[in-house]
A protein has these predicted regions:
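Acidic, glycine-rich A-domain
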Residues: 1-156
Length: 156
């Protein structure tokens, strides 16, 4: 499954581009991805994790493309139900907690960091040792492929 997430008003929107069992031609939908600000990373990771845990496959792997900035601050949202900003230490801690929770449930989680070097320390706090820093997108498939191979070989 390939999906993205963003906040729209009071809602976190999960957009599914491709499902697990879709035909190979569905991969074209991935190119419909557009970036968006305001992301409740912890909630999206928790939701994606529940989807994985419901699957029958033995190995469960979640790959998260991240900029290292979990951030959702309500701006110009009249009558918003959740006015508490999601940013800074609280957002980082929430995201890291959801990652640890999934790992405790034996889901392998890889953070793929494509952000700025100044945010690298935050990425380490969120993902611990299992993250890859992608400086050049051309290396994405090679780096993620190595991680997938390693995860599939463990106890395999």
């Amino acid at each position: 499954r390939v999906m993205s997430f963003c906040t729209f008003w009071d809602y976190t929107i999960l957009h599914r581009f491709r499902e697990y069992d879709d035909p190979r031609t569905a991969k074209e939908n991935i190119f419909n991805y557009v970036t968006s600000s305001n992301n409740r990373d912890g909630l999206a990771i928790k939701t994606a994790g529940y989807g994985l845990l419901a699957r029958e496959e033995e190995k469960k792997i979640l790959i998260v493309l991240s900029d290292g900035k979990p951030y959702d601050v309500l701006v110009n949202r009249p009558n918003a139900r959740n006015p508490k900003p999601y940013q800074g230490k609280e957002a980082i801690s929430d995201t890291a907690t959801e990652i640890r929770h999934l790992r405790n449930l034996e889901v392998s989680v890889l953070g793929v960091f494509a952000g700025e070097e100044k945010d690298l320390a935050t990425e380490k706090k969120i993902f611990g040792k299992d993250f890859a820093y992608i400086r050049d997108i051309k290396n994405f498939s090679k780096i993620v492929g190595r991680y997938l191979t390693k995860q599939l070989e463990i106890d395999g």
